[in-house]
Curated annotation (Swiss-Prot):
The gene is MFN1. It is an enzyme of class 3 (hydrolase). Residues 371-408, 679-734 form a coiled coil. This is Mitofusin-1. It comes from Homo sapiens. Ubiquitinated by non-degradative ubiquitin by PRKN. Deubiquitination by USP30 inhibits mitochondrial fusion. Ubiquitinated by MARCHF5. When mitochondria are depolarized and dysfunctional, it is ubiquitinated by a SCF (SKP1-CUL1-F-box protein) E3 ubiquitin-protein ligase complex that contains FBXO7 and PRKN. The chain crosses the membrane at residues 585-605, 609-629.
Length: 741
């Protein structure tokens, strides 16, 4: 980098450099703030970035925006103070090489005036509290404007904007502030607060025709109290007056020098004695302004009448300007930029810590997510394998339980069938042979038997079956419970309640015995049909009594004579003795049923054989027995016969449904247990689905975490680069602070 011509360029370059750095810093912090905000507000990335991190980053973004605006308005500021008519305005004009501010006889600065450059080609001024730009073409117009504004007080500020093209000094962000005399007001504290706290250099313009006054010293003592070691220059103006008394000039100069040194070194203690030598100057601003105006017009500097020693005074003024420019540029860079540089380093250090914490949190989360994904895959495989094994075990268990239930119900039902007669005898209701009454009687008897058998079966089986079902359900739950999440395990008693199982036997007894036909007609025990039933059984007797009139074999045509060629009845070779008996009786019945002659013939045969007395006795006894049985055939006897017939019929029917009833009960048990298992399987399926979704989600989360790690590392590297730029700025523009650090 080429060495700048003017020391003031040092500030300009520093301002440009620090502004560029802070623009990058603001862009960087904005990017980091968006990154932290996106990370913090991502619901899938819990505890990666905290709310405090986000608040801190957003706070830095706002602060850097403000600092950027402040830096853009930063400039070097020099404030001129002194007694009234000490030549403050003349010094400013001399430094500007033009009569910018009103000065000289009759012109007294009655308020604060700041002179700064403008890029335009027209001068203008702005008063405090107004944004109006008042055009000013000449110094006289400026003086007139200031004089005519009655609202301007000593504590007001009027900003004068002078074209930079007309004054080189104003091109380098330098603002010169003129002030009223320190001896015209007591509001020194308000002046300091309003105009001095941001000043880089103070110039005390003293009248060399007199010594430093207490009012001047008092003001700078107050400045020294508010600012740490302010940069103060003392200009002993109007030194050209000493040319009229050359014999006293050195003594007066030495006297002024001693008093100024004492003031700076001993009283204010802002510099040491050696440094103070370069802070005190003896000049004539009026002479310098006149000479420079001459030079600006192309005429020699000494073209006007000047006092003796002018060149020495001009050289000293130029020395003052050189040292002043070096001092103010260094001081302004330090005061305007050093704290911002330190603050920027602190912000970068904090941002690096935030990025490091985000990186570490993302790394821990990513490592945890990788392990969690592996665990979820292992658990999913474990659940699937266990479900296959448990399904087989449950099927086997269900088969065992249903077989046991079927056996229990079958045994209990067989026992109840054996006790059916007792249950029928317990039934009491009005009995009458009338068909309508019998219908009601049978209906009530069916209901009584169905309720009784159902109750007895429930008493014998329900509790045992229920206990068996509950035990089996509990075993299944305990086996599948480890496959479910802890939260679901705690809620299993509500999701799958193990209620008492009510077994339904569903005998449907009414339909079962709906085709029962009672037979309560009186039959003599020695009657023909009774004997047939007794000897042949009900089925064969039915065949005989239903009218098998045609005999299977032929009887002899003549019973009295003996045939010459008797024929033997043709019977099948494989006919049994029972079938032969049926054939004989049927044949006999056929004969007796054809004609009443059979009775006479049989009676005659018996009478011839045993005699009439024995026959009479037999008939008497037979008739007495018939009469007894006929009189004993009461309604109660009919009811007993009815119940016995019903028991026999129902027993046969119930034995036919024992297997189906037990199978139905076992099916109910199977359904109950299978339902419980299905609900558990549903919960396991939900768990598997959740695991599958989690396994599918975790890779995306891992990718997000890797991106966050990469972004945090990238942002941290940017922070390091900005730190390096700040360090280079410090080395280049703030060497003293760099050495101190």
């Amino acid at each position: 980098m080429a060495e700048p011509v003017s020391p003031l360029k040092h500030f300009v370059l520093a301002k440009k450099a620090i502004t560029a750095i802070f623009d990058q810093l603001l862009e960087f912090v904005t990017e980091g703030s968006h990154f932290v905000e996106a990370t913090y507000k991502n619901p899938e990335l819990d505890r990666i970035a905290t709310e405090d991190d986000l608040v801190e980053m957003q706070g830095y973004k706002d602060k850097l925006s403000i600092i950027g605006e402040v830096l853009s308005r930063r400039h070097m500021k020099v404030a001129f103070f002194g007694r009234t008519s000490s030549g403050k305005s003349s010094v400013i004009n001399a430094m500007l090489w033009d009569k910018v501010l009103p000065s000289g006889i009759g012109h007294i600065t009655n308020c604060f005036l700041s002179v700064e450059g403008t890029d335009g080609d027209k001068a203008y001024l702005m008063t405090e509290g107004s944004d109006e730009k008042k055009s000013v073409k000449t110094v006289n117009q400026l003086a007139h404007a200031l004089h005519m504004d009655k609202d301007l007080k000593a504590g007001c500020l009027v900003r004068v904007f002078w074209p930079k093209a007309k004054c080189a000094l104003l091109r380098d962000d330098l603002v010169l502030v003129d002030s009223p005399g320190t001896d015209v007001t007591t509001e020194l504290d308000s002046w300091i607060d309003k105009f001095c706290l941001d000043a880089d250099v103070f110039v005390l313009v003293a009248n060399s025709e007199s010594t430093l006054m207490n009012t001047e010293k008092h003001f700078f003592h107050k400045v020294n109290e508010r600012l740490s070691k302010p940069n103060i220059f003392i200009l002993n103006n109007r030194w050209d007056a000493s040319a009229s008394e050359p014999e006293y000039m050195e003594d007066v100069r030495r006297q002024h020098m001693e008093r100024c040194l004492h003031f700076l070194v001993e009283e204010l203690k802002v510099v040491n004695a050696l440094e103070a030598q370069n802070r005190i100057f003896f000049v004539s601003a009026k002479e310098v302004l006149s000479a420079r105006k001459q030079k600006a017009q192309g005429m020699p500097e000494s073209g006007v009448a000047l006092a003796e020693g002018f060149h020495a005074r001009l050289q000293e003024f130029q020395n003052f300007e050189q040292i002043f420019e070096e001092c103010i540029s260094q001081s302004a860079v330090k005061t305007k930029f050093e704290q911002h540089t330190i603050r920027a380093k602190q912000i970068l250090a904090t941002v690096k810590n935030i990025m490091d914490s985000v990186n570490l949190a993302a790394e821990d989360k990513r490592h945890y997510s990788v392990e969690e994904r592996e665990d979820q895959i292992d658990r999913l495989d474990f659940i699937r394998n266990q479900m296959n094994l448990l399904t087989l075990d449950v099927k086997k268990k269900i088969k065992e339980v249903t077989e046991e239930v079927a056996n229990k119900v079958s045994c209990a039902m067989t026992d109840e069938i054996c006790r059916l007669s007792v249950l029928v005898d317990e039934f009491c209701s009005e009995f009458h042979p009338n068909p309508d009454v019998l219908k009601i009687y049978k209906s009530e008897l069916n209901k009584h038997i169905e309720d009784g058998m159902g109750r007895n079966l429930a008493d014998r089986c329900t509790d045992e079956v229920n206990a068996l079902v509950l035990q089996t359900q509990q075993e299944i739950i305990e086996n599948l419970k480890p496959l479910l999440p802890a939260g679901i395990q705690d809620k299993l008693h509500t999701l799958i309640p193990c209620k008492k199982f009510d077994l339904s036997y569903n005998l449907n007894y009414h339909k079962l015995c709906s085709d029962f036909q009672e037979d309560i007609v009186f039959r003599f025990s020695l009657g023909w049909s009774s004997l047939v039933h007794r000897f042949l059984g009900p089925r064969n007797a039915q065949r005989v009594l239903l009218g098998l009139s045609e005999p299977i074999f032929q009887l002899p045509r003549s019973l009295a004579s003996t045939p010459t060629a008797p024929t033997t009845p043709a019977t099948p070779d494989n006919a049994s003795q029972e079938e032969l008996m049926i054939t004989l009786v049927t044949g006999l019945a056929s004969v007796t049923s054809r004609t009443s002659m059979g009775i006479i013939i049989v009676g005659g045969v018996i009478w011839k054989t045993i005699g009439w007395k024995l026959l009479s006795v037999s008939l008497t006894m037979y008739g007495a027995l018939y009469l007894y049985e006929r009189l004993s055939w009461t309604t109660h006897a009919k009811e007993r016969a009815f119940k016995q017939q019903f028991v026999n019929y129902a027993t046969e029917k119930l034995r036919m449904i024992v297997s189906s009833t037990s199978a139905n009960c076992s099916h109910q048990v199977k359904q109950q247990i299978a339902t419980t298992f299905a609900r558990l399987c549903q919960q396991v399926d939900i768990t598997q689905k959740q695991l599958e979704e989690e396994i599918a989600r975790l890779p995306k989360e891992i990718d997000q975490l890797e991106k966050i790690q990469n972004n945090s590392k990238l942002l941290r590297n940017k922070a390091v680069q900005l730190e390096n730029e700040l360090e280079n700025f410090t080395k280049q523009f703030l060497p003293s602070s760099n050495e101190e650090s």
